[in-house]
């Protein structure tokens, strides 16, 4: 069984339906671009991260990274939007669409993260990190054949985290500097 996603221009709502051996969902309510069938394995769909923890700036960054990685893996940005502000949501959604247009998904794993001292401002908190990642590019076709990787990447990043009206912390923006080559 695999999840089939149809991505592209869509003004409709998301939904799922079971039919035969595939489940299907229409994604792309926020995306623009040519329609594409995206197949996602049941294992990828089942790899749901822990629930969002948005009570502190650091926990918000961790949740953002977990849920954004999951969104990239299943080509569905909406699952991660509660961890981020609207502008960051557009950026994540655009990156998913970019990968779909290249007929690929990205499967990434955060291997390690070290948090630096936060800089607390009047409206936001800056959280510096050092991150180690492993990632692969997978085909959007049935079976999700590995197209490239696994690769490793290291980043020095700074997360701007803001508090919402509900009192949750969310990632408003990310500045990431690759330390070495990223493929």
Q: Which residues are covered by each model-predicted region?
A:
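Core segments of small alpha/beta cavity-forming domains
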Residues: 34-108
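Glycine-centered loop/turn positions within well-structured domains
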Residues: 7, 78, 167
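Exposed beta-sheet edge and beta->alpha loop/turn motif
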Residues: 13-17, 21, 122-183
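Juxtamembrane and targeting peptides
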Residues: 1-59
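Short amphipathic beta-strand and strand-loop transition segments with alternating hydrophobic
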Residues: 112-122
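Short coil-to-beta-strand transition motifs
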Residues: 105-110, 151-154
């Amino acid at each position: 069984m695999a999840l089939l996603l149809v991505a592209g221009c869509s003004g409709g709502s998301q939904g799922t339906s079971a039919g035969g051996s595939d489940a299907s969902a229409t994604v792309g309510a926020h995306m623009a671009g040519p329609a594409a069938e995206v197949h996602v394995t049941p294992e990828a769909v089942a790899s749901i991260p822990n629930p969002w923890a948005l009570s502190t700036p650091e926990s918000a960054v961790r949740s953002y990274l977990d849920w954004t990685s999951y969104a990239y893996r299943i080509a569905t940005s909406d699952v991660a939007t509660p961890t981020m502000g609207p502008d960051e949501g557009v950026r994540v959604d655009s990156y998913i669409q970019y990968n779909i247009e290249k007929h690929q998904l990205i499967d990434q794993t955060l291997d390690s993260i070290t948090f630096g001292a936060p800089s607390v401002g009047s409206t936001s908190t800056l959280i510096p990190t050092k991150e180690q990642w492993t990632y692969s590019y997978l085909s959007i076709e049935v079976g999700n054949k590995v197209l490239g990787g696994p690769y490793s990447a290291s980043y020095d990043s700074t997360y701007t985290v803001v508090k919402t009206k509900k009192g949750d912390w969310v990632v408003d923006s990310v500045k990431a500097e690759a330390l070495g080559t990223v493929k």
